[in-house]
Amino acid sequence: VIGSPVGAYFVSGVKPLRLLVERKQARTAPGGTGEAKCGGNYAASLHSQIEAKARGCNEVLFVDAVEHRWIEELGGMNFMAVSRDGQLVTPELTGTILRGVTRKSILEVAPDLGLEPVERKIGIDELLDGVRSGEFPEVFACGTAAVVTPIGSFLDGDTEVKVCEPTGKTTMEI
């Protein structure tokens, strides 16, 4: 066991993230190590991370490697969305998404916060349309280092989609 002091995962603290939507480059593929915590998974996301930084984004939201339409996760964090009707929606585990401890914990406490946890496929277009319409007023990333970090906007190509409540009540409670 090695212990060392660390700072915040994001230097800016808990401020809403701006995400680059990555529709082409995959973080991992079926049959690989996507659900494991291993260096190769992070290395595969570096090219997209460099592009995200160059475009003024904090992180990358990856979709699946096969159809390029189903949300998977960020470079090193799981993804969750709060729906207008009280669901806490997160991509179902498919073998390409990290079985995050923080993700699991949030899903377990969701009912105590009045949320219905739902694990299912989430299409990237469904998400972006839902953010625009207010169906998903809050979205956030979560992970051991990143804890719960609100998402403020998505950059999809040249289109910016802003979240209605980037530091919403539910996200901050979680």
Residue ranges and their predicted role:
Residues 2-174:
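Helix-start/capping segments and mature chain N-termini
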